[in-house]
Every structure is written in C-alpha cells, then in structure tokens.
Amino acid sequence: MFLVNSFLKGGGGGGGGGGLGGGLGNVLGGLISGAAGGGGGGGGGGGMGLGGGGGGGGTAMRILGGVISAISEAAAQYNPEPPPPRSHYSNIEANESEEERQFRKLFVQLAGDDMEVSATELMNILNKVVTRHPDLKTDGFGIDTCRSMVAVMDSDTTGKLGFEEFKYLWNNIKKWQGIYKRFDTDRSGTIGSNELPGAFEAAGFHLNQHIYSMIIRRYSDETGNMDFDNFISCLVRLDAMFRAFRSLDKNGTGQIQVNIQEWLQLTMYS
C-alpha cells in the first residue's frame, strides 16, 4: 500500500569511494540522463473537501481553507499509481533488462547488509549523480529533502527504502528530471516562475495561481527561479499529499474527514 495505510493503523553511505562510487555514478548517471521528458497522467473524479474539526475564522484558517480548496480542485485531475509492493532483492523479474540487473547489483552494494537505503545513503547517491549533470543548477540534495523522499515511499515505515521502493522513486526522479530540462526553455539551469505551471502540469499537477504563488515563495529563490533539488522536493511533497488524500477517500466521494491526530500523522511523515 502507501504511507497512509500505516497512518490509519496508528503509525505514524552510498557516497563512499572505491569501485562502487565510480560504477554507481556511471550507471545511475546513465539512468537519469535517459529520461528525455514526459509527464504524469491526468484523469480522475470530482472535487473534494476536508471535513472534521471546528474552529473560528482568522488568517490561518482562511489560508488553510484556500490551500485545501486548491488541492481539492487539483487532486481530481491527478491519479498516481501506488508504489509497488516491497519484495526481496533476490526475486529478479524474468524480463529485467541488463541495465536493471546492473542497477539491482549496485543497489545491493549501496544498501548494505540490511538491503535498505537510508535517507543519508539516498542523499549521497543523488548528489553523486547530479554532479555529472552540470546543466542542472542545484546546491545538492539536503538531508531533509531525502528524508521526505524516503517517507513518501516508505510503505512499511521502517525509515528506509527497499529495492522496489528505491527503483520506483528513481523512476519518478528520472521522469521529473526530463520535465525539468524540457521546461528550462532558456537553458538557465533553473525553472522560472513563468515556466513553472507548464512543468507541473506535465508532471500531472494542475494547480491554481494561488498555490503556484505559495510554491514559488517556499521553493524558489528571491528572483522566482527554482533549482533542480527544490523542484524534486516540491514534486515529492505534492505527490505525497495527493496519494494520501486518495488513500483516505476510500469511497471515491471526493471528501475526507480526519481528526487532529490523523492530520498530524499524515502531515508530519512526508
């Protein structure tokens, strides 16, 4: 399932040297550069709202209401596939390509004895790969961004990623990298505020101007430009929010009702 499954049940060093560093960088660098673009899908049902809780007016509630209203409009058009179920690395698929087999072999080396990738290990390998792409302007992936990525994909709340989870996340990053390059029309290495709506729609997120303004204030620099790591970080969080909503909307009504405990569990582990 997805992270919300565990919420409702009450839950809440790849950067090393040697042969692994070079080999892993080469293979994963090739994998990420293989993404030529593409976008997310649309589709989906009607609007949605958030029930539960009382409360008065005030600025905070008006802002929250606006955010939820915008998410309600957008989520109807975003229909992500759930992450694949966790499986042991030895269960090699018969139709796995040579590149995928090499990817799996290197994952085994990266993950170590527990066969899982931590946020720190994810950060190290992502930063190793992006250094091979000077056309992507980035300060590098920080630990908070990588913790968010792990939380989004962590189906059993171990705090780490198994092979299938890691591979699924990597495929998303490849897709989003292709979109990032395609919409960096001026080849500045960043996406400007005027380029952002098209990029997000290509990734499957149809948002209103109010949400775009909030995203720019949160993830872009003072000139309105968004670098690669912030672009990925933002998409990871959007993806998590929409997935969580759809998991909670079990009857497909477009509405959910959560209490404060469920809300905190949902928003704090993403």
From Swiss-Prot:
Cell compartments where the protein resides: Cytoplasm; Cell membrane
Question: Where mainly located?
Answer: cytoplasm
Q: Which residues carry this modification: N6-acetyllysine?
A: 181
Quote the record's binding site residues for Ca(2+) 4: 139, 227
Q: Residues bearing Phosphoserine?
A: 6
Which keywords, in A-to-Z order, does the entry hold?
Acetylation, Calcium, Cell membrane, Cytoplasm, Membrane, Metal-binding, Phosphoprotein, Repeat
Annotated Ca(2+) 3 binding lies at: 184, 186, 188, 190, 195
What residues bear N-acetylmethionine in this entry? 1
Q: What does this protein do?
A: Regulatory subunit of the calcium-regulated non-lysosomal thiol-protease which catalyzes limited proteolysis of substrates involved in cytoskeletal remodeling and signal transduction. Essential for embryonic development.
**Classification via PANTHER family:** CALPAIN SMALL SUBUNIT 1 (PTHR46735:SF1), CALPAIN, SMALL SUBUNIT 1 A-RELATED (PTHR46735)
Protein name per UniProt:
Calpain small subunit 1
Q: Which organism is it from?
A: Rattus norvegicus (Rat)
